[in-house]
Amino acid sequence: LCAAQADIVQTVGSTSGLEISRAPGQDKFQAYALQTFSGEQVAAPMLEGCVAWLECRLLPEPGNHQQYDLFLAEVIAAQADARVFSDGRWHFEGHDELRTLHHVAGGHFLKIGDPVDGKILLV
């Protein structure tokens, strides 16, 4: 998700999917007219407007699922928006609205900031 999507992220994330699903044939994608496309490897909708997508295969771990509500997955495909990702790196300069969005709490988000390069220190 990117900074341009903060409002819809907050709205969809604050809405109960259970409440929406009580209407026949409704889910959050339909209720909020979220546009999707098909993944390359997994039969799951990929949300349009993001800057990256991961397709995953669930790793069955029933104990983790039941005891901790924890799900583990293996990434089997990845895509990224070429406007901000190339040569194995993110390049957000000039695309502030596409900076990745990170939820903090209570409707507050951070977007990824300026790059900082580290140097190897000699000891």
Predicted segments, located by residue:
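Basic, polyanion-binding surface patches
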Residues: 1-123
